[in-house]
């Protein structure tokens, strides 16, 4: 009996304590508060237009998503020192005061996504959140990332910035995020990746940059990403990518480069060579230009396919499936630099020969003379980088100083052979005369006429020899 009485007393004490706690820590009217598994204040989809007052200070989790809250005032959660999870996604947030999250030193997850009217976040909003490891800012209509926005977030591992209106990636934006492993930037309007955009991201494992407007990536942009395993760059405006960009990615396993207007000419050779050695999983890299290689996978081309320049200076026709402007196209490298030749020997398309140009005055065999109104043709003037029979040899074959490329003859034109002593018939001589008559003027003409004259006098010489030996009849 004593044991039963003792057990009943304990149960009664527990009920009384629970009731006292409820009175001491009231729950906001539109919310539900409970203690297991953690002290939680849950107010989702209640039509709230402001952050409710009276949230229990002991709350470890606060769920305010799916309401119509438009403003988060300063110190809204300052009394909730034990807060680790705060969900404010899917509201109508247009303004968050700089000190809205002051005092939340234990906060680990902050979800502000799906607030399309937010646009701008004060650079000091997240200062002091030293334990934050997940931050959702996706679909917030963000136009820019202010300087120092992520300063001090040393514990951050997941950063969601996709589906915003970001139009730039400022240098050093993520410099303090040394523990970041996942960075989502897809679905924005980012036009380029500067040199220090990802500086300090030594732990990054996944970088999603697809569905942007990226047309240029600085050669050193991925320098700190030695641990990166997944890189998505598909559906951008990339026409070429220096192989130097990918060199630091020693751990890369998954690469997607499809849906870009790739130009598969000599400037794609470094990327092609890198892809041949890459042992991870990669998407196709469909060529957009030149037209003869359209829709073919760069990885499956031969090195000999990547010759010449597919895009020359001057007016351009639009590149299919791309959004490149004429200004962006004009910024592309005009042609490939020779490996060993003097840079002065490189002619840009349409540029006349100059005094310092090794090609000055050279007319390759078979070209028409300058007098007919057409000058020498160069390899870069040929359509889509092809080399027609009337074009000059590749510039890489030129020696410094303008000497002839290896393999070209250095002597004058070869003379046509005359009639041999064994075949001195008139038919052979006529053939020889016809062949010599088709040649040009000058030395070539004279050299072809002498054998023909010798053949025509051969019968007369034979008659004189017979007359001398046999005597007159």
From Swiss-Prot:
Keyword ATP-binding attached: no
Glycan attachment positions: 82, 179, 372
Membrane-topology annotation of the record: Lipid-anchor; GPI-anchor
Top-rank taxon: Eukaryota
Keyword presence, Membrane: yes
Residue span of region Disordered: 346-446
Subunit: Homodimer. Interacts with MAG. Interacts with RTN4. Interacts with NGFR. Interacts with LINGO1. Interacts with KIAA0319L. Interacts with OLFM1; this inhibits interaction with LINGO1 and NGFR. Interacts with OMG.
Family the UniProt entry places it in: Belongs to the Nogo receptor family.
Function: Receptor for RTN4, OMG and MAG. Functions as a receptor for the sialylated gangliosides GT1b and GM1. Besides, functions as a receptor for chondroitin sulfate proteoglycans. Can also bind heparin. Intracellular signaling cascades are triggered via the coreceptor NGFR. Signaling mediates activation of Rho and downstream reorganization of the actin cytoskeleton. Mediates axonal growth inhibition. Mediates axonal growth inhibition and plays a role in regulating axon regeneration and neuronal plasticity in the adult central nervous system. Plays a role in postnatal brain development.
UniProt name for this protein: Reticulon-4 receptor
UniProt source species: Mus musculus (Mouse)
């Amino acid at each position: 009996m004593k044991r039963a009485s003792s057990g009943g007393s304990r149960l009664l004490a527990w009920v009384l304590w629970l009731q006292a706690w409820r009175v001491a820590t009231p729950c906001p009217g539109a919310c539900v508060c409970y203690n297991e598994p953690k002290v939680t204040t849950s107010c989702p989809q209640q039509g709230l237009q402001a952050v409710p007052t009276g949230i229990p200070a002991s709350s470890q989790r606060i769920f305010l998503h799916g309401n119509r809250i438009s403003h988060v005032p300063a110190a809204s959660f300052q009394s909730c020192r034990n807060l680790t999870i705060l969900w404010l996604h899917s509201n109508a947030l247009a303004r968050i005061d700089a000190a809205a999250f002051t005092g939340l030193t234990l906060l680990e997850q902050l979800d502000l996504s799906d607030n399309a009217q937010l646009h701008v976040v004060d650079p000091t909003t997240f200062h002091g959140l030293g334990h934050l490891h997940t931050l959702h800012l996706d679909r917030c209509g963000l136009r820019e990332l202010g300087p120092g926005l992520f300063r001090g977030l040393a514990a951050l591992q997941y950063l969601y910035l996709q589906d915003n209106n970001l139009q730039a990636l400022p240098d050093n934006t993520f410099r303090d995020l040394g523990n970041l492993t996942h960075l989502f930037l897809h679905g924005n309007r980012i036009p380029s990746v500067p040199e220090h955009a990802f500086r300090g991201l030594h732990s990054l494992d996944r970088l999603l940059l697809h569905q942007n407007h990226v047309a240029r990536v600085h050669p050193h942009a991925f320098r700190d990403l030695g641990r990166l395993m997944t890189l998505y760059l598909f559906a951008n405006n990339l026409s070429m990518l220096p192989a130097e960009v990918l060199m630091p990615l020693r751990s890369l396993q998954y690469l997607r480069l499809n849906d870009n207007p790739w130009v598969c000419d000599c400037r794609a050779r470094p990327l092609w060579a890198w892809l041949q050695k890459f042992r991870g999983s990669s998407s196709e890299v469909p060529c957009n230009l030149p037209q003869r290689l359209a829709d073919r996978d760069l990885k499956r081309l031969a090195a000999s396919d990547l010759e010449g320049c597919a895009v020359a200076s001057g007016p351009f026709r639009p590149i299919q499936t791309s959004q490149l402007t004429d200004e962006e196209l004009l910024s592309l490298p005009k042609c490939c630099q020779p490996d060993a030749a003097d840079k002065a020997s490189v002619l840009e398309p349409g540029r006349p020969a100059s005094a310092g140009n090794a090609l000055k005055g050279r007319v390759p065999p078979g070209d028409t003379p300058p007098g007919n109104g057409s000058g020498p043709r160069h390899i870069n003037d040929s359509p889509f980088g092809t080399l027609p029979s009337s074009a000059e040899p590749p510039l890489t074959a030129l020696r410094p100083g303008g000497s002839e490329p290896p393999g070209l003859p250095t002597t004058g034109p070869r003379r046509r052979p005359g009639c041999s002593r064994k075949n001195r018939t008139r038919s052979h001589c006529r053939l020889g005369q016809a062949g010599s008559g088709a040649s040009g003027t000058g030395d070539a003409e004279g050299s072809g006429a002498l054998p023909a004259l010798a053949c025509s006098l051969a019968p007369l010489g034979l008659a004189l020899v017979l007359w001398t030996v046999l005597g007159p009849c």
